[in-house]
A protein has these predicted regions:
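Conserved post-catalytic alpha-helical subdomain immediately downstream of the catalytic base
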Residues: 137-183
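Ribokinase/PfkB-type carbohydrate-kinase core domain
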Residues: 1-144
Length: 183
């Protein structure tokens, strides 16, 4: 398994080249590739992210990213999703995931879902879609309060998902494992 994030190629042009070389090597050896889109506006513009990351998606099997990442990194406009209100409309994710599956042929598309009630009170769940069958699943929701520190939440989510899939869990069980690992 090879995992990378959108942060790595954002660091420099040399990092873009090295990331693509690593992805080519992974694919040449039939290694599953996952990405956490992880857009960081302080590292690069949405325009450059879209140019670079769209090219790298040809190597990706499993794509993790929220609706902002899908828009800023891949150019997909979210439909019925409003994270600023703390209310998440799953239909918006189904729409975005279908667009991503159509364009890139991902095996799985995943997003963590954070409902921010306050800085120390969040709802936490995730959703996944099988890119081939278009089966969509929304995980159990955790109510996290008080939040001690959000640093590393996305990384532990990705690690839990990868662990679940490598261990042979189906997509639903792998997603539940990822959400629990990062809650």
């Amino acid at each position: 398994w090879f995992h990378f994030t959108g942060i790595t190629p954002a660091v420099s042009d040399a990092a873009i080249e090295l990331t693509e070389a690593a992805l080519k090597a992974a694919k040449a050896h039939n290694v599953t590739v996952s990405v956490d889109l992880n857009f960081r506006k302080k590292l690069w513009s949405s325009e450059k992210a879209q140019k670079v990351m769209t090219n790298l998606m040809q190597y990706v099997d499993v794509c993790i990213g929220n609706e902002e990442d899908a828009e800023k990194v891949l150019g997909f406009k979210p439909g019925n999703t409003d994270v600023t209100s703390g209310e998440l409309e799953l239909a918006g994710y189904v729409d975005i995931f279908n667009q991503m599956a159509d364009k890139f042929g991902f095996k799985y598309i995943i997003s963590s879902l954070r409902e921010s009630h306050s800085a120390s009170d969040n709802g936490w769940s995730a959703c996944i879609m099988d890119g081939k069958t278009r089966e969509f699943y929304h995980s159990r929701k955790y109510h996290i309060t008080p939040i001690v520190d959000r640093v590393g939440g996305g990384d532990s989510f990705a690690a839990g998902l990868i662990c679940g899939l490598v261990d042979g869990k189906d997509m639903k069980a792998a997603l539940e494992y990822a959400v629990a690992a990062s809650a």
